[in-house]
Design a protein with these regions (language model features):
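HAD-like aspartate-dependent phosphatase fold
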Residues: 1-121
Length: 121
């Protein structure tokens, strides 16, 4: 089983910033995002959406996910925002973490070898 933490804006729908929150309810899903995420859920994986949207936008976000039939098990609001293209997230955990940078195409995951950051020996 995998636990997926999936961003919303720019990953499963149009890239809308908090400053344009009036557009959250009319965002369009990105092609194949729902199908792929729902497939993972139906395979027994856990789906959490992890978004930089603010807590005050929880209800409109939940409604959007429901209206567009995204299977999910939870919604985490308030992810720290990367304000520049050069910014990146670094997640440190005592469990295995796999990072996937969404690059505009949804589909099955494939295994590749990459150079990663790690602590010393």
């Amino acid at each position: 089983m995998k636990i997926f933490l999936i961003d919303i804006d720019g990953t499963v729908c149009d890239d809308i910033k908090n400053e344009d929150s009036h557009l959250f309810s009319v965002a369009m899903p990105i092609e194949n995002s729902r199908e792929q995420i729902n497939k993972w859920a139906q395979e027994g994986n856990i789906i959490f959406f992890f978004t930089a949207r603010e807590e005050e936008h929880r209800e409109v976000t939940k409604k959007w996910l429901e209206d567009h039939n995204f299977i999910h098990h939870g919604l985490i609001m308030g992810k720290p925002r990367c304000l520049n293209q050069e910014d990146e997230y670094v997640w440190i955990d005592n469990r295995k973490v796999r990072g996937i940078t969404y690059n505009s195409i949804w589909g099955d995951l494939k295994e590749v070898e990459k150079k990663i950051l790690t602590f010393g020996d």
